[in-house]
Amino acid sequence: LLTMKFFPKVRASFLCLFLTFLLILNGSSVSGIHGWGSNFGRAPLLERFFWRNMDFAYPDEASRQVAIVKGEFIPENSLPVGIEVWRTKLFVTIPRWRDGIPATLNYISLDTNRGGSPKLTPYPNWAQNKAGACGSGLTTVYRIHADVCDRLWVLDVGTIGIGNTTVQACPYTLNVFDLTTDKIVRQYTLRPEDTNQNTFIANIAVDLGKGGCDDAYAYMSDELGYGLIVYSWEQNKSWRVTHSYFMPDPLAGDYNIGGINYQWGEEGIFGMSLSPLAVDGHRTLFFHPLSSRREFAVSTRILKDEQLSQDSYHEFQVLPERGPLGHSTASVMDDSGVQYFNLIDQNAVGCWNSLLPYAPINQAIIAKHDEAMIFPADVKVRRGLLWIMTDRMPVFLLSTLNYTDVNFRILTVPVQEALAGTVCEATPWRYVGNRVWWDR
């Protein structure tokens, strides 16, 4: 301090830096947004939201306490599994695997919540999240999709519980919301022949063709019934596709995640991602069973034709394996043909540029963190950002979560920065189609 008295410019600079440090520190603690230095990629992961356990935006604290006393809300029983982003809404889904889940489809306002652990607001309202209210309420929702026509595609599987405790309270029903009005514009109940006694549908992909908003198809993966249900918006009709590639790999049922060794040998088709439109006017659906380390693909030209889809075994393509730590949950592909896929064995997200052959040498890890990313359950690309939901699902299901620790996170990373310097970075070629690149 004595020395600095004779150097006023140095002293001023020091004070400036010190005050800046205090402002940054204070801002971080107020906002609740923390950066996680990723082990891979130039851009750090940003922890946008985090929770020890989930909470809901009741009208007042008295209502919340009444719900807790009645057992309608049990904070430790909520596990978030799916996310979606539309404008200033961040949607979060929570299946009713246990008692005390007040709402299965929820959102966070990105306008009013800049970080921290915000309470979830039921979407579109409390009344339409009533369990067992078939036709008027949502019972259990897993993953969802918002399309460019401002529609939110929501499959209500109608179940309460999980595994041996499952009760089919309502039929499988596809609900499509107009996000500009928060009203359901289409409600479709799956046909009995679309499902079987083992059906478990936890994912949906939505395909928009050249014909605009009416040229829409939804693909729903039946993870335990080993099928794919296709729904046509224009025809207002559904059909089921079966193929042996939807089944699990018997050699890929062993998992080591979050310090737990367990076996999920029955897990079939789960993750799905759609390519950009190819020159033939169709997309490619990439998919993988959860208990597998391999990717598969089929043209949507096959899936969108009910008759053709029943007899096109050889139209389905087998791609190489991702490697020994290649279990993957959700995946998504952006408009340039880059696929992003959650690698649950590695607490990471990987990438593949589909203009290159599908092989480990053409894949990279772009986000990884051994604390923040235990079991990445969902992934989306929106507005130039990669959004990742992590939820420690195996610990929740097979052990006990520590509710003094952060268990659930929503993380983001800028796509361009995440891909920079990797084999997935943009190539000078234009996306045309995938078949030629698979065969190279």
Residue ranges of each PLM-predicted region?
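Blade-level signature of beta-propeller repeat domains, shared across WD40, Kelch, NHL, RCC1
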Residues: R293, A377-R440
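Short loop/turn segments immediately following the C-termini of beta-strands
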Residues: P95-W97, V157, S221-G225, W233, ...
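Blade-loop segments of beta-propeller domains
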Residues: L79, I108-V167, V185-P192
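Beta-propeller blade signature
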Residues: A103-N113, A169-K183, Y231-E234, N402-A418
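Short loop/turn segments immediately following beta-strands, especially the blade-tip
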Residues: I108-G115, T180, W233-W239, V298-Q310, ...
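Beta-strand-rich domains and repeat architectures in extracellular enzymes and scaffolds
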Residues: I33-T104, Y142-R143
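Beta-rich, blade/repeat-based domains predominating
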Residues: I74-R87, G132-L155, E193-A218, M247-T284, ...
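Surface-exposed loop and turn segments in beta-propeller and other repeat-based domains
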Residues: L45-E72, G116-S136, K183-T199, S238-W264, ...
